[in-house]
Amino acid sequence: MPQIGTVIRRTKNFYYVDIGESEPRLCHIRANLFHRNPKKNLVAVGDQVEIDTADADKAGWILKMLPRRTRLSRRQSADSSEQVLVSNADIVLVVASIRSPPFRNGLVDRFFVAGSCGGLKTVLILSKADLSTEEEIASIKNLYLSLG
């Protein structure tokens, strides 16, 4: 009988799906889902999926994916297609050093844009404040607060 679960881990050929048991269920993806677009990462961590778990001693099968609420994705460099890194999350926590290594606002900005495009709330956490001046902290804080 099919069950609904959440993908909690992905390896090259397997997905680990939490269906409320003590251990996650090891699953394969059905060929008909894979052949729709074999180059694309169809199932991501966080996806809600319907799985067939008929035989408790064997790996299950992912039958279909349920619609995503949110996603954090990036463009794959080879063909510019979207690669979903995580789905159905509520928040993205971006941890960035103020110093050592220096703050990289371009990188932080990309996370904010990716989170916003995927429907996620994004929060910036600044680390290594003890190595920074009050002015450096205030400058970064004021910049991102002014952006919303």
Language-model regions, residue ranges each:
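Residues at alpha-helix caps and immediate loop-helix transition turns in enzyme cores, especially N-
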Residues: 104-107, 136-137
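Residue-level signal for inorganic ion chemistry
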Residues: 46, 115, 127
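Structural beta-sheet core signal
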Residues: 94, 124-126
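N-terminal accessory targeting/assembly segments
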Residues: 1-105
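Conserved Walker B
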Residues: 98, 128-129
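Histidine-anchored nucleotide/phosphate-binding helix
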Residues: 106-119
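Canonical P-loop GTPase G-domain recognition
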Residues: 121, 130-148
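Short glycine-/polar-rich loops that comprise or flank the Walker A/P-loop
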Residues: 88-91, 118-122, 147-148
